[in-house]
């Protein structure tokens, strides 16, 4: 959905011709992308009708084009669609804080439990994980391993009554000083199984008395998330929703909008497989990334969490100010594994709508390519590091021999450098536009 909407935005902003016809074409493109993302058709028609009406009636302020104002309208209406101005309260209002994770089998509860633990450990909390799932083979071992990776305490039993296991786990972890306790529960398949799941969930809730019940939903179920959330809510009031696997499905938009319609608060979204790829869901920031306006706040949060934060702060400042050299790229590469794929990082920058014109393959750096590029940069002279434009064919051959790579590898790195420079020039223009629109993000 992100890529499709971003392409539509870029096409609209670059296009010419009659404004009214351009609006019609953009609205149709937007409808197509939202429906492909499994957003409810009625919701799609309502939001695009409001966008079109406002785009044709409203007059932009001096200095702002009608097309730029149109994107501001799209931004505001999509924010409403995805839940409005809600900002999740991620830090618990008190400690200890007990979180009960619930959901159907396959939704990613256990992985999410590990991600939540990692998220709060990084924020300075002492976290404990409880495995009460005695039904799924390997659930105990999986959560224990995740607890170790996240730096959290763990309690679990392979057999027994799940509600009693949860109670004993809570007592044990609190006695060890846990400030946040996350209880992982079993899931079920099928309607009849779901009824038993809800009964078990109520039994566990009565034993641990959670401060928050978080429903974990797989993004791939799309708009079915609405019915699922409502059924769980009738059994035990749902305090928050976590939508997982947003990176692996085109139906994530449907799941998010469906959950938002229920009135439940979407607190986190899972954006990848690693422990660090869980982020608070803020509709304004999410929509900004969809439209290519960026999400600098999320980017800076990731940067601050890195062990190499000091080094990356300099790299981020260089990128945002357009001062890009091979030294900047080298610092990016060194911390890339913790930041996540470069494509995701660049989506957080204003101007990401222009990424549609850049070869996506050049942005998805694998481990081997990262190693090759770092070796190439290490083989450059100081002058080449600061002025990559001087690197000609003769220098390419020398660098390739010195780094144990090929001339094609060196050329590929230089193409990436030029693409990044080009994108940052467009970023400056977009930042000025956002300020005029009063949409600093």
From Swiss-Prot:
CDD domains in alphabetical order: SRP54_G
Protein family: Belongs to the GTP-binding SRP family. SRP54 subfamily.
UniProt GO MF annotations: 7S RNA binding; ATP hydrolysis activity; GTP binding; GTPase activity
Pfam family, one: SRP_SPB
Quaternary structure (record): Part of the signal recognition particle protein translocation system, which is composed of SRP and FtsY. Archaeal SRP consists of a 7S RNA molecule of 300 nucleotides and two protein subunits: SRP54 and SRP19.
Function: Involved in targeting and insertion of nascent membrane proteins into the cytoplasmic membrane. Binds to the hydrophobic signal sequence of the ribosome-nascent chain (RNC) as it emerges from the ribosomes. The SRP-RNC complex is then targeted to the cytoplasmic membrane where it interacts with the SRP receptor FtsY.
Highest taxon listed in the record's lineage: Archaea
Organism the protein comes from: Aeropyrum pernix (strain ATCC 700893 / DSM 11879 / JCM 9820 / NBRC 100138 / K1)
Database matches in InterPro entries: AAA+_ATPase, P-loop_NTPase, Signal_recog_part_SRP54_M_sf, Signal_recog_particl_SRP54_hlx, Signal_recog_particle_SRP54_M, SRP54, SRP54_GTPase_dom, SRP54_N_sf
GO cellular component: signal recognition particle
Annotated residues for binding of GTP: 103-110, 184-188, 244-247
Record localization: Cytoplasm
Top-level taxonomy: Archaea, Thermoproteota, Thermoprotei, Desulfurococcales, Desulfurococcaceae
A GO BP entry: SRP-dependent cotranslational protein targeting to membrane
EC numbers, comma separated: 3.6.5.4
Catalytic activity: GTP + H2O = GDP + phosphate + H(+)
UniProt keywords, alphabetically: Cytoplasm, GTP-binding, Hydrolase, Nucleotide-binding, Ribonucleoprotein, RNA-binding, Signal recognition particle
Protein name: Signal recognition particle 54 kDa protein
Major localization listed first in the record, in broad terms: cytoplasm
Note on domains (UniProt): Composed of three domains: the N-terminal N domain, which is responsible for interactions with the ribosome, the central G domain, which binds GTP, and the C-terminal M domain, which binds the RNA and the signal sequence of the RNC.
Transmembrane segments: none
Major enzyme class: hydrolase
């Amino acid at each position: 959905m992100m890529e499709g909407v971003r392409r539509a935005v870029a096409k609209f902003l670059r296009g010419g011709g009659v404004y009214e016809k351009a609006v019609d074409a953009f609205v149709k493109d937007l409808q197509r992308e939202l429906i492909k993302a499994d957003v409810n058709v009625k919701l799609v028609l309502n939001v695009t009708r409001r966008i079109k009406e406002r785009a044709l009636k409203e007059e932009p302020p001096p200095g702002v084009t009608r097309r730029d104002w149109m994107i501001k309208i799209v931004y505001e209406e999509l924010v409403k669609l995805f839940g409005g101005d809600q900002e999740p309260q991620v830090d618990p209002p008190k400690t200890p804080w007990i979180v009960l994770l619930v959901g159907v089998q396959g939704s990613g509860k256990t992985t999410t439990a590990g991600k939540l633990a990692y998220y709060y450990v990084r924020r300075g909390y002492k976290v404990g994980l409880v495995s009460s799932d005695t039904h799924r083979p390997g659930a105990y071992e999986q959560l224990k391993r995740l607890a170790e990776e996240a730096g959290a305490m763990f309690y679990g039993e392979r057999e027994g009554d799940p509600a009693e296991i949860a109670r004993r786990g809570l007592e044990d972890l609190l006695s060890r000083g846990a400030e946040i306790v996350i209880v992982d529960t079993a899931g079920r398949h099928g309607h009849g199984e779901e009824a038993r799941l809800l009964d078990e969930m109520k039994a566990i809730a009565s034993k641990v008395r959670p401060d928050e019940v978080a429903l974990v939903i797989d993004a791939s179920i799309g708009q079915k998330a609405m019915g699922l959330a409502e059924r769980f809510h009738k059994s035990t009031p749902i305090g928050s929703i976590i939508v997982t696997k947003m990176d692996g499905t085109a139906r994530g938009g449907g799941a998010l909008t469906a959950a938002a319609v229920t009135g439940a608060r979407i607190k986190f979204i899972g954006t990848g497989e690693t422990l660090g790829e869980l982020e608070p869901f803020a509709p304004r920031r999410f929509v900004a990334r969809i439209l290519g306006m960026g999400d600098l706040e999320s980017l800076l949060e990731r940067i601050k969490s890195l062990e190499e934060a000091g080094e990356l702060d300099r790299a981020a400042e260089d990128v945002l100010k357009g001062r890009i050299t091979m030294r900047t790229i080298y610092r990016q590469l060194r911390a890339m594994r913790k930041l996540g794929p470069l494509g995701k990082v660049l989506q957080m920058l204003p101007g990401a709508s222009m990424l549609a014109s850049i070869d996506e393959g050049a942005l998805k750096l694998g481990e081997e390519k990262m190693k090759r590029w770092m070796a190439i940069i290490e083989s450059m002279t100081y002058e080449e590091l600061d002025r990559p434009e001087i690197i000609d064919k003769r220098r390419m051959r020398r660098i390739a021999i010195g780094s144990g790579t090929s001339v094609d590898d060196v050329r590929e790195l230089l193409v990436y450098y030029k693409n990044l420079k080009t994108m940052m020039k467009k970023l400056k223009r977009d930042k000025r536009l956002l300020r005029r629109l009063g949409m600093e993000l």
